[in-house]
């Protein structure tokens, strides 16, 4: 029989109330209270919920705050971790959620974050700052949009805003360190850039190189439209010049 044990149901075993900051725990195999370590362990398809945040895992461990024995200050998630918010879903192997800071650090092989616009994977951690409405992915990051365009970098920061319906949606992604964009028609590299979710364009800066079917353009600024797969070098208003190498098409033999 499925056992759903909310934290509130443990009050008979604990001197102080354990439901704090509107956090609840569900688990198929039960919830254990370890008084000495001041922690709760939920096992078997465990779920922690707080307002519009949900964390699922094989095992969840809730730690009480040293200063306030009736408040959970940190949650650890182990095994098949999934965190869901109104704007994203994240997946990994382990997560640490700081309740006070409203921050979650996810690790996986790889860690993954999905929004309606993009799917982002990272060899390193993904840190989600819910109160700041942003997610940061480090090390070997790859983003893929709905049209199959690939964006690579060592650091990506996704920012979210509320739309006219008061729903959180992706606003932009800041892309830094070893940036590369691969579309069906071109490969573009740069030091940094910013993806605008509304326009579907990525604006690239510093040491930009566009390779389109063997034709190469170089400059300090560029624009890649992920909707049309068109990339172009932009003037930076300085004295720097745009250079290009164009591949001559081979004539067909008669």
Language model: regions and residue ranges:
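Mature-chain termini and adjacent capping regions
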Residues: 1-254
């Amino acid at each position: 029989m499925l056992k759903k044990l909310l934290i509130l149901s443990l009050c008979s075993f604990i001197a102080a109330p354990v439901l704090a900051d509107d956090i609840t725990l569900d688990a198929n195999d039960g919830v254990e209270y370890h008084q000495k370590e001041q922690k709760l362990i939920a096992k078997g398809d465990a779920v922690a919920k707080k307002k519009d945040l949900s964390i699922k895992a094989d095992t969840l461990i809730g730690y009480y705050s040293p200063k306030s024995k009736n408040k959970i200050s940190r949650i650890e998630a182990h095994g098949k971790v999934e965190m869901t918010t109104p704007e994203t879903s994240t997946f990994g192997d382990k997560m640490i959620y700081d309740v006070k800071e409203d921050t979650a650090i996810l690790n996986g092989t790889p860690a993954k974050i999905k929004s309606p616009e993009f799917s982002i994977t990272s060899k390193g951690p993904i840190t989600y700052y819910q109160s700041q409405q942003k997610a940061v992915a480090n090390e070997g990051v790859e983003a893929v949009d709905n049209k199959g365009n690939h964006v690579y970098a060592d650091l990506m920061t996704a920012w979210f805003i509320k739309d006219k319906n008061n729903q959180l949606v992706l606003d932009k992604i800041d892309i830094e360190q070893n940036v590369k964009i691969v579309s069906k028609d071109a490969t573009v590299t740069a030091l940094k850039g910013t993806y605008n979710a509304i326009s579907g364009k990525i604006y690239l800066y510093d040491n930009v190189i566009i390779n389109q079917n063997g034709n190469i353009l170089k400059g300090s600024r560029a624009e890649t439209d992920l909707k049309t797969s068109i990339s172009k070098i932009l003037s930076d208003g300085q004295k720097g010049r745009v250079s290009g190498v164009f591949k001559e098409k081979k004539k067909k033999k008669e």
